[in-house]
């Protein structure tokens, strides 16, 4: 509904192929940065950021320029060692190792109920206020893929 009200087109990460470049768009905002694990990190909510949709505008708008530096530049980077199964590599992510861990009791408690340990290890994520039920919902959706 919003898209028709402001003369735009709604797009979602799952639309495609071709898939919209959400990752690149996020970085271009100057509010999201590439973390040491290649996940997006947001200046306010850390690694808990997720992009569920976007609006493609049919008119030009001015976007404020954000010259902030990545919060990772001054961080001790706890995300790099937080994964209990070392699923994050320099250039890849082992989703099967992650899902296997989530199927055992320890993994269910540590990550399924409380959120991805890597994401929650980010100091900025600790202050984001995400509701535990929202975290559980997204972890269940991840396991269904």
Q: What do these predicted regions represent?
A:
Residues 1-145:
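Non-ligating segments of multi-cofactor redox enzymes
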């Amino acid at each position: 509904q919003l898209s028709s009200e402001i003369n735009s087109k709604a797009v979602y990460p799952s639309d495609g192929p071709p898939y919209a470049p959400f990752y690149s768009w996020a970085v271009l905002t100057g509010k999201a940065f590439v973390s040491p694990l290649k996940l997006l990190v947001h200046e306010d909510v850390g690694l808990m950021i997720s992009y569920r949709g976007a609006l493609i505008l049919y008119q030009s708008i001015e976007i404020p320029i954000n010259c902030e530096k990545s919060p990772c530049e001054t961080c001790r980077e706890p995300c790099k060692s937080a994964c209990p199964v070392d699923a994050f590599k320099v250039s890849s992510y082992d989703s099967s190792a992650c899902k296997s861990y989530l199927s055992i009791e320890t993994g269910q408690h540590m990550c399924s109920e409380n959120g991805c340990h890597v994401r929650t290890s980010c100091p900025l994520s600790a202050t984001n206020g995400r509701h535990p039920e929202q975290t559980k919902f997204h972890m269940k959706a991840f396991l269904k893929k």
